[in-house]
Amino acid sequence: MDELQDVQLTEIKPLLNDKNGTRNFQDFDCQEHDIETTHGVVHVTIRGLPKGNRPVILTYHDIGLNHKSCFNAFFNFEDMQEITQHFAVCHVDAPGQQEGAPSFPTGYQYPTMDELAEMLPPVLTHLSLKSIIGIGVGAGAYILSRFALNHPELVEGLVLINVDPCAKGWIDWAASKLSGLTTNVVDIILAHHFGQEELQANLDLIQTYRMHIAQDINQDNLQLFLNSYNGRRDLEIERPILGQNDNKSKTLKCSTLLVVGDNSPAVEAVVECNSRLNPINTTLLKMADCGGLPQVVQPGKLTEAFKYFLQGMGYIPSASMTRLARSRTHSTSSSLGSGESPFSRSVTSNQSDGTQESCESPDVLDRHQTMEVSC
């Protein structure tokens, strides 16, 4: 039996530093819209034009960020242009989180996380968009997940970075309330995004985002968004039972790529989410030497993974890319017979836990297996 080979990706350069940090927050060739919904006005930024019947890539940022600070470093990355030439991009800013947003009036009731998800259908209708491939980070990943659960016909695929499918426990809630009395909101947000190792080691990145959160985001509005996220409900998703009709289980129906850095505070939450999703259409990407913002510090790896993801959905089949080191984790009940790919691959078995790992051609998607990727 062949030995499993790992191939390392060469692009591991952080995008943010003192010279180009500001540039990577900038928008290029964009159109901005303020769209009225039943739950308030939402700010949307469009890059490019929709391509025929193709879905639009729709992004949703995390707390303490907006679309610029969360995604522009990723979408301005050179290799991403191979993707954006085939897809329009729609960036959604949560209410009051966009650059230069005024404070909400006293007594304003900020939308719940469920209501934020329900603001998206009017956005698609207003822009005449038929379907999306969503990319969400943290709170944005939760919102897009809720949107996909409520409107599966509008979502073709999801890339969920640092997603937490669980409601905030009462102990966590009490701790956050207590910390809020002694800690400013900027420190709370930084602890949400970055682990202790990254907070101490990546000082330039932390300082860039500390200044952005404190100076570019309306602090009153940020507190409202943070409170909404802390009050989220459990997504109540569950892994389908083998042999059961998928329509009887509450789970994401679309192709889903879960992403988390190995030093991220969200690792446990993402692993929990993976355990609840359908292994047939879910991939878990764990990024080595990476913290809470993989789209910023490891754009090359994430871009390549996103290309594979789109290829698996039948888009951009001619995209040029290097080989990605991958390993699959199979359940013992999975069959390698009828679902076996015609492409060659090597498989190694772990007798102690009954799992198998494989390395295969990047354009192969075995729909009967759960895939776990490490890079």
From Swiss-Prot:
Q: Polar residues bias located where?
A: 347-359
* Expression by tissue: Ubiquitous. Highly expressed in brain.
Chain intervals for the UniProt region annotation (Disordered): 326-375
Indicate whether Ribonucleoprotein appears among the record's keywords: no
> Which stretches are tagged as biased composition: Basic and acidic residues?
364-375
Q: What family is this protein classified in?
A: Belongs to the NDRG family.
The protein's name? Protein NDRG3
Native source species: Homo sapiens (Human)
Please name the gene that encodes this protein: NDRG3
